[in-house]
Amino acid sequence: MNQTMKDRFALKAPEGKICWQVLQQNMSQRCNFCPVSKLLRDPSSNKTIHWEEVNSKTGRIYENHDSLINWFDGSIVHLQQSIDITDSKKAFHDACFDELTNTLTRRAGKELLEKLIKAAHQNCHGFITCMFDINSLKQVNDNYGHSEGDKLIITICQTLKKYLGSGDIFFRLSGDEFIVVFTE
């Protein structure tokens, strides 16, 4: 374990300890998401299992790469390489989701719409696209303030999201303009 990880988990000497005892919170046995059992089913396969976890001790997100290796004494041991991807995930989320409405941003929405159009052409299926804006938003902002205008936008978005299917796309095109794509 490198020093950065020791510092992040506030560990002095974790070497030789079982991972769930030092890297997880309130665990009394191997984690239910641990891939060791899968790896042990065929220890000679040399496969690596890739997965993500939100760590129970730090709350950070890790991309894990687990495999079994032959140790210097001939035993087979579990090796896990973990990369903290929390900041990358946050940056990706911030780039793709509008901070006010938590809908897709213009760029992310348009990219998904392009993919949907290509898939629709290839698979000969249709969809419905709806563009709408919020009438009188300027008057709400002028008369009651931008915080009330923001509340109006948020309420409309939250209400609409309740009626969307899992394959539908909803994104903010600009200030008060939105696109909804119904796929089902």
Residues of each region from the PLM?
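Sensory beta-strand/linker motifs that couple input domains to effectors
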Residues: Q81, C130
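PAS-associated C-terminal cap
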Residues: I83-H93
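Short loop/turn elements at sensory-signaling interfaces that couple input to output
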Residues: G59, N64-H78, T86
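N-terminal capping loop/helix in small sensory signaling domains highlighted by a polar->aromatic N-x2-3-F motif
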Residues: M1-F9, T105
